[in-house]
From Swiss-Prot:
It comes from Protochlamydia amoebophila (strain UWE25). This is ATP-dependent Clp protease ATP-binding subunit ClpX. One of its GO terms (cellular component) is HslUV protease complex. The gene is clpX. InterPro entries: AAA+_ATPase, ATP-dep_Clp_protease_ClpX, ATPase_AAA_core, Clp_ATPase_C, Clp_protease_ATP-bd_su_ClpX, ClpX_bact, P-loop_NTPase, Znf_CppX_C4. The keyword ATP-binding applies.
Length: 413
């Protein structure tokens, strides 16, 4: 038998030892062989994600606020407060020695309060986008403590985990925004001897994950069951931002300060001056939130507390036109894509903003008002190629008067 045929006879995988006859393919190299089965095995190993060492952005407070300014009009104090709080939070994570000289840095969770549509949720969303970290929103009113019908607090962590594509390390540095936090207040500031399923009990349930714990998260959500497998998530470095309207909080602050907040109009109705209200809310203390019905331990987990003021007419007009993704800019771009130039008069913008104020939902109402205003045009424009320009006037907003339309080779009339 020749040397060449002997070599072929004895050829086998250098990794598993299988002979050429036992495999489909045997790939040869200089004095080495690998079979198709080992190639597939190696490919599978390489395809597996290595443990995440997710690196997040860490921006200085001024840099964070500058980016928030691009999308959020007004709320200067809230933006500064949250910028400092977020910077300190992520600086704490980045620090290699969190307990230098025996000093332990606490979490900088943030509590935002203010009326509906004042920008609380938008601030949190924009922040997550700026920092490029996983983000999720939860509604506090759907949460119940363990053992009651409703949503477990661990499901909030699950949604963050899903936003991070189940990358645990990435989720552990994400942001969770819990809205309507004021709706889980105690009905009285005194400790109740009865069980408060959706109030104090939920605050107690949230305490651990907010301050930092190893949460056992059901991978498919729902209630926990014995013998169920869990994903362990450390919440120590998750930034929690909570928000709520905290209606009439200014009255609690005024009482503490010995001031009167209420006036009366000609019809003997209560009137609260917006400037006075804003000034009072800027003087909020943890004890005011406790008096409102939040438990002391929960309030104590939030080092940064900021007020989002009620938006006034000039604010709403600016929100329509100024931010990077302003609603008016979006509609102008949509019409431009159809070859139509869309314009609004200043009076029209003011009328839209005034309708939002009357709706009582702040900036949230702006998009709906615009959608209703522009719906018929958005329906007709794609089928009418003769239109070149559209001008929206105040009367179009307030009286449903048709807008001024210019067609190709025609003047606006």
């Amino acid at each position: 038998m020749s040397k060449k045929s002997l070599t072929k006879e004895l050829a086998s995988c250098s990794f598993c030892g299988r002979t050429e006859e036992a495999v489909e393919k045997l790939i040869s190299g200089p004095n080495v062989y690998i079979c198709d089965k080992c190639v597939r095995l190696c490919t599978g190993i390489l395809d597996k994600k290595a443990p995440s060492t997710y690196e997040f952005k860490i921006l200085k407070p001024k840099e964070i606020k500058e980016k928030l300014d691009e999308y959020i009009i007004g709320q200067e104090n809230a933006k500064k407060t949250i910028s400092v709080g977020v910077y300190n939070h992520y600086k704490r994570i980045r620090s290699k020695n969190k307990e230098a000289d025996g000093i332990e840095f606490s979490k900088s969770n943030v509590l935002l309060f203010g009326p509906t549509g004042s920008g609380k949720t938008l601030i949190a969303k924009t922040l997550a986008s700026i920092l490029d970290v996983p983000f999720t929103i939860a509604d506090a009113t759907t949460l119940t403590e363990a053992g009651y019908v409703g949503e477990d607090v661990e499901n909030i962590i699950l949604r963050l985990l899903q936003a991070a594509d189940y990358d645990v390390a990435k989720a552990e540095q994400g942001i969770i925004y819990i809205d309507e936090i004021d709706k889980i207040n105690r009905t009285t500031a005194n400790v109740s001897i009865t069980r408060d399923v959706s109030g104090e009990g939920v605050q107690q349930a949230l305490l651990k994950i907010v301050e930092g714990t190893i949460a056992n998260v059901p991978p498919k959500g729902g209630r926990k069951h014995p013998n169920q497998e869990y994903i362990k998530v450390n919440t120590e470095n998750i930034l929690f931002i909570v928000g709520g309207a905290f209606v009439n909080l200014e009255k609690i602050i005024a009482k503490r300060l010995g001031r009167n907040t209420i006036g009366f109009d000609g019809s003997n109705r209560e009137v609260v001056d917006p400037t006075q209200k804003s000034l009072l809310l800027s003087k909020v203390e943890p004890e005011d939130l406790i008096q409102f019905g939040m438990i002391p331990e929960f309030v104590g987990r939030f080092n940064s507390i900021a007020n989002c003021n009620e938006l006034q007419l000039p604010d709403l007009i600016n929100i329509l036109t100024e931010p990077k993704n302003a609603f008016i800019k979006q509609f102008i771009a949509m019409f431009e894509a159809e070859g139509v130039k869309l314009q609004f008069t200043e009076d029209a913008l003011a009328a839209i903003a005034q309708q939002a104020i009357e709706a009582g939902t702040g900036a949230r109402a702006l998009r709906l008002i615009l959608e209703n205003l522009m719906r018929e045009l958005m329906y007709e424009i794609p089928s009418d190629e003769t239109i070149s320009e559209i001008l929206i006037e105040k009367e179009t907003v307030t009286e449903k008067k048709p807008p001024i339309i210019k067609r190709h080779d025609q003047k606006i009339a």
